[in-house]
A protein has these predicted regions:
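CheY-like receiver
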Residues: 12-13, 47-50
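Active-site lid/adjacent beta-loop-alpha segment flanking the redox-cofactor pocket in flavoenzymes
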Residues: 173
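Charged catalytic carboxylate motif
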Residues: 9, 43, 126, 130
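A conserved helix-loop-beta module that forms one wall/lid of the active-site cleft
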Residues: 1-35
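Phosphate-binding core of ATP-grasp and ATP-grasp-like enzymes
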Residues: 50-119, 124-158, 162-170
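Flexible glycine-rich active-site/ligand-binding loops centered on an Asp-His dyad
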Residues: 176
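Rossmann-fold NAD(P)-binding glycine/threonine-rich loop
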Residues: 37, 41-43
């Protein structure tokens, strides 16, 4: 991936990364908004106009499905050592993840999350492992929506980290 601020930078990055590529707004993108496919050099100006600001361009991933893990990171109070969970020692970080969900989009908007995903057990385990790795390197506490692409050969690739309650975690009481 590369940061780009001009059509010339976008064209140069796409020459290096290959076409097609995906241009993503650095700020304000949500639920597919701010994402524009770049099929050729001729698309550079229009693609940048569409994202309306600084962007990232990345290699296009031909994925089988998008999956996500809702993950939560908390900690004991550093000043008092208090926690809501007696099983957590003072100063330790508490983490939890929910089952891997499969996200179904229509017109770039998430319309349905299938839990558990139809992914292989190996792919689900890998998504959970990477989600825990993400929590390990993030300084913030709270709920994270961590999205992945699952490629056609079952590889898991990190797509997005949303440091907030994520719409793929808006389950019904029957689904929880």
């Amino acid at each position: 991936y590369r940061a780009v601020d001009s059509a010339d930078e976008l064209r140069a990055a796409c020459e290096e990364l290959g076409y097609p590529a995906m241009l993503k707004a650095r700020m304000g993108g949500y639920d597919g908004r701010g994402n524009v496919p770049v099929e050729s050099k001729a698309d550079a100006e229009d693609a940048l106009d569409a994202v309306a600001g600084p962007a990232m361009v990345e290699s296009f991933v031909d994925y089988a499905r998008e999956v996500s893990v809702i993950a939560v990171k908390g900690a004991t109070d550093e000043a008092t050592g208090e926690t809501d969970d007696d099983s957590v020692e003072s100063g330790e970080t508490e983490v939890a993840t929910f089952p891997v969900g499969e996200n179904v989009h229509r017109e770039e908007i998430l319309r349905e999350t299938i839990v558990p995903t139809r992914s292989s057990e190996t792919a689900q385990e890998r998504a959970q492992e990477v989600a825990l790795d993400v929590l390990d390197v993030m300084d913030g506490r709270g709920v994270y929506g961590i999205e992945f692409f699952e490629t056609r050969d079952g590889e898991i690739q990190l797509n997005e980290i949303a440091p907030r309650p994520h719409n793929s975690g808006h389950w019904t009481i029957e689904g929880a």
